[in-house]
Design a protein with these regions (language model features):
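Metal-dependent phosphohydrolase cores
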Residues: 1-104
């Protein structure tokens, strides 16, 4: 897939209202944390590491899919903090909506 198209779909995730809302809520909730904050840097670091593992293991996942997963892997953290919902369950529900809206 062409790089320009890949970045367009990743940009759609970043600008999606649900992603932006959940990310902002998480940033506010973690503003006083010193370590292990779920910042954009964290999301992108995870994506970069996943991409390296993907190449080394010849797993065959697309760069677009890896970056989408990296951006969304902790998107349910705020709901976990506020409601006690396991973040992987909250995240799966939120990610499904975001990914569907972004034509994944």
């Amino acid at each position: 897939m062409e790089q320009r198209i890949i970045m367009k779909r990743i940009d759609q995730i970043l600008s999606h209202p649900v992603f932006r809302e959940q990310f902002a809520l998480l940033q506010e909730a973690e503003k006083d944390r010193i370590f292990c904050r779920h910042t954009m840097e964290h999301f992108l670091d995870v994506a970069r590491l996943m991409y390296i593992y993907n190449l080394e293991d010849q797993a065959g996942f697309s760069k677009e899919m890896i970056y989408a997963a990296g951006l969304l892997h902790d998107i349910g953290r705020y709901e976990q903090m506020e409601k006690g919902t396991p973040h992987h369950l909250a995240g799966a529900r939120l990610a499904e909506r975001i990914l569907t809206d972004c034509d994944f």
